[in-house]
């Protein structure tokens, strides 16, 4: 799931969690919802725009073993009261920032030094990678834990990512509150593909750069109020700190990435 989508989908999750707890066991295999509101995810790249979020959809289908969940497809091979393990295919989310960049004439390089003449500069493009991996989900009275390991199978970056996230939710009548924290380890190949600068991309503005592996950290806070069986009003705030190797890239202007989304969530089924 893309990082931008995750903010709105987290809001919809508050609707689903409350409603699912009230529904019988023969509920529909489909989960369909929509979020209406306003949010922004900051873009850490130089010469880029923040990413707006206004309307988003939550579409998922869960079979006995196979599932589709907002772009992720998977096969669940273990499922019990405390642990679910699945084989999952997805698109890497690091590329999303590169879709909101601009081309401009600049008079200084990225280090702030003046150029002899105005130069046309654009942030190099990057491709989406198709990744395959294992996802483990565990929950209990102690909270919820998600752990994943994904590897590129599309020969895009040929790297891998290790991810872990822990959250604990409180519910009081119509209110639901859930903070979560986590980290993701990016291999050198993955980090360098998205944040490195290759020799054929070097120019008067952009110097060469090779990124090594690194560890991102993130935190999220979700607050929701259940208006009815299908409607809720929620606020989601998210923070991510890029690893030092990514932050040192000449493509990156800000190591800290902030996001928020507030609005109404509606669950169709």
Task: List where the protein language model places each region.
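Short glycine/proline- and aromatic-enriched beta-strand/turn motifs that initiate or cap beta-hairpins
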Residues: 21-68, 73-74, 95
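Surface-exposed strand-loop-strand hairpins of Gram-negative outer-membrane beta-barrel proteins
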Residues: 42-55, 104-106, 110, 115-126, ...
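Residues on the lipid-exposed face of transmembrane beta-strands in outer-membrane beta-barrel proteins
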Residues: 36-38, 57-63, 75-77, 87, ...
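Structural signature of outer-membrane beta-barrel domains
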Residues: 39-43, 92-96, 152-154, 184-190, ...
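Predominantly the C-terminal beta-signal and adjacent terminal strand-loop region
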Residues: 226-269
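Cleavable N-terminal export/targeting peptides
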Residues: 1-29
